[in-house]
Amino acid sequence: MNNAANDGYGERYYRVLHAANDLKYFSVKIKESDLAIAVDRKSYSDSLLSLCQRELLGVRRQLEDYIKRHPEFMTSFVPLPLMVGAPEIACRMAAAAEKAGVGPMAAVAGAIAQSLGQALENQVQEVMVENGGDIYLLSKNDRVIAIFAGSSPFTYKIGIRVEPEESPLGICTSSATVGPSISLGRADAAVIKAYPAELADAV
């Protein structure tokens, strides 16, 4: 199920509408992972890009190595027990999957977003990491997250307000009509707020 070519999602066109002037935006991409990252302008430095690249490469390598040992982790639609020596990211995904009653890969985008966000927290005051519609947010200011729902008339007309005391927080979107991810539902956009981000993603 991949309609990215005709829904504007493949190039992440919705990202050009980022409107928080107090944040500095940059992106990191490795293989399937294509992340938009925002930090407060006072904290930004070019070194953050390298930090994010290293963190993304590291978590991907850990997960890929684990999947080589446990291929079912990649394909299962139901929760799975972990093999001995599973990396932290696989453990977090499996825990979220167990709570949601889904396969562990349902939590992968949120888990990666949170991994990068937490890697930045000691370097910045505020951070937002968006990974294919799944967001990890740590903010000291009110934020409104606009909902992208493809060709739906509600696209960009609905937003979710997040107050500082709610963060850190995961805000994750699932869609049956937008993007390459497998969806067993029918909604143009179903949005969940939860912590950690991998739980919001899995649900």
Positions of PLM-derived features:
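Short, charge-rich amphipathic segments
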Residues: 1, 40-56, 133-141, 156
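Short, Gly/Pro- and small/polar-rich lid/capping loops
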Residues: 1-16
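Alpha/propeptide regions of enzymes that mature by internal proteolysis
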Residues: 2-4, 45-129, 193-203
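A structural signal for small-residue-enriched, beta-sheet-centric alpha/beta enzyme cores
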Residues: 11, 20-49, 67, 80-81, ...
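Arginine residue identity/basic-tract feature
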Residues: 12-15, 41, 54, 60-61, ...
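Short, solvent-exposed secondary-structure boundary motifs
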Residues: 15-20, 126-127
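Glycine-rich anion/phosphate-binding loop at the beta-strand->alpha-helix junction
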Residues: 98-178, 183, 193
